Amino acid sequence: MAKLEDVYVPIFTSLEPVYGEGSLLQEATRRFDVLKANFNQIFGASPQLFARSPGRVNLIGEHIDYEGYSVLPMAIRQDTIIAIRKCEDQKQQLRIANVNDKYTMCTYLADPDQEIDLQNHKWGHYFICAYKGFHEYAKSKGVNLGSPVGLDVLVDGIVPTGSGLSSSAAFVCSATIAIMAVFGQNFEKKELAQLTCECERHIGTQSGGMDQAISIMAKTGFAELIDFNPVRATDLKLPDGGSFVIAHSLAESQKAVTAAKNYNNRVVECRLASIILGVKLGMEPKEAISKVKTLSDVEGLCVSFAGDHGSSDPLLAVTEYLKEEPYTAEEIEKILEEKLPSILNNDPTSLAVLNAATHFKLHQRAAHVYSEARRVHGFKDTVYSNLSDEVKLKKLGDLMNESHYSCSVLYECSCPELEELVQVCRDNGALGARLTGAGWGGCAVALVKEFGVTQFIATVKEKYYTKRVQKGVVKEEDMELYLFASKPSSGAAIFNF
């Protein structure tokens, strides 16, 4: 029988179950004290409860969750905490404040049906994503939440923004859980993982679900193999003797702002690649357009084709049927016998991609997805193998290096800063290093032998960050936000105290 805290978001009356002891607990205690004091000062009342959700680092399995494939992230200690209270006694407003002065208070109507103004990007929009998504889901479950009421909300997030560590998912997940808890509900974690993934689509990002699933389902001491359809998490104990170091390239990745040319562009390219593979492998164009959504949908056909050639590798079909040269819109429309906007259901997010794109690299995107999916299972199989910990760590590092090459060359989601940072990590003792998160900026993750972590961090700081400190790109006193080691940390929680 599964424990309740494995099924539902746990509710705690103290911080220790999540933050442990020592310096992490001291830091958390200070943050909660500041949140309570600031909440009282801003809103003239105390919060009813708190919710928190962590950021994450993806160890391997990049850009494949939205294609239906398993991924392998772990939660990090950096999180977003939200203090919240219902306001039955005031105008029906959502007042969303932040402990960081950089983010001014946002005010919205307490209306679950309101549209989000995507042309006017505000940090508070992420809370409205959660607000809308929660109400839609509660309604679909037949939960009566009564008439809309105002909410006072104070946010404290320490996941670096634009870092590839899922600051947006940590915010949306903690917001959804805070709203859920203040309305007296507690949905199952697997439901919340799906719900919060849908929430982020309100802000125009076609999220695959990994970031939300790990933020909600993580357990202290374990990475998680996250599977989709249905969402489930399998605990993975990493080999002894290794540690993960996370390093920010200092190039910020604004996923929601650049989506049409970067993140959402790749989603569309993968969809088009999968439909063309379906057609080339025997489906009628109309059938493929209506039934094929992801590359995992046509993997069976690709494997069957490979089987006829003495293999089980879906990449054979990619090599045979998708040309390496970029496709034009006209070439794709000729193969599929339909216009691209119609193929993509005239979806506004996809139309924005079509307006921004001049060509589509279908071969490269499909090759990345199928090879990266295989690497995830290679990572899992290595962890479960009978090899020595030292050999396991070497193999895991090799897989991380292969993953970065694929992300950089086939998926083209790296940037010059990430390339430099990954090389610095490898040149100075990392067993493996790769970009993590959506890419186009953000962080790299390096696998390092535990006994060498302190020296590794000092060397990377000297070789990559010192010149950037001198140029004023980053402050010396903020370095621990941008370069740190992390153990697998705890997932989402509710606090009542």
Feature roles, as predicted:
Residues Y137-P148, I179-L195, E450-K463, K467-G472:
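Phosphate-handling active-site elements
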Residues S53-E67, D156-A175, G429-L447:
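Glycine/serine-rich anion-binding loops at beta->alpha junctions
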Residues A75-Q78, L165-Q185, V448-K449:
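DPxDG-like acidic metal-binding loop motif
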Residues S70-D89, A218:
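Structural signature of FAD isoalloxazine-binding scaffolds in flavoprotein oxidoreductases
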Residues M1-R56, I60, I81, R85-N120, ...:
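C-terminal nucleotide
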Residues Y131-K132, E136-V159:
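Glycine- and acidic-rich phosphate- and metal-coordinating loops
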